[in-house]
Amino acid sequence: VTEVLDELAALRDRLVAAGVHAENIILDPGLGFAKGGMQDWELLAALGQLHALGHRVLIAGSRKRFLANALNAADAARAKPQYPAAGAGTVPDQMPPARAPEDRDAASAALSALVAAQGVWGVRVHNVPPTVDAVTVANTLRTVIRTNQT
């Protein structure tokens, strides 16, 4: 996370030094690029630090492999082993198939709603309508919660 934040801050400094107005800078942490394991999730968990750089933030997590990995792990954990009848041989492979990119749209919409709730300026997605719905529902709930707290 620190490496990505430092890299974005350095890039921002070069842009400003080259004459780009700070209000024209949008930061994208590059989810899925040169990252592995939990790094994308760690970057998402550190959105506050990214916001602290003082610019709009764009998240492009739609259909990315890190979503598939989370979904595939959950699918595997939910899979119930099927045991063959006595003497019928070995237990067949019970791993569910990996999620195809288009089967990650619900997860992409959920991620978009979550990061929008954290103040992200924009999201890049493949399937816009369900994402708009997810963000709208999350924003409506946030508004009601805020209203009830005042």
Located regions from the model:
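Active-site pre-Tyr helix/loop in NAD(P)-dependent dehydrogenases
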Residues: G30
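Active-site-adjacent loop and "lid" segments of alpha/beta metabolic enzymes
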Residues: V1-R14, A18, E23, F33-T150
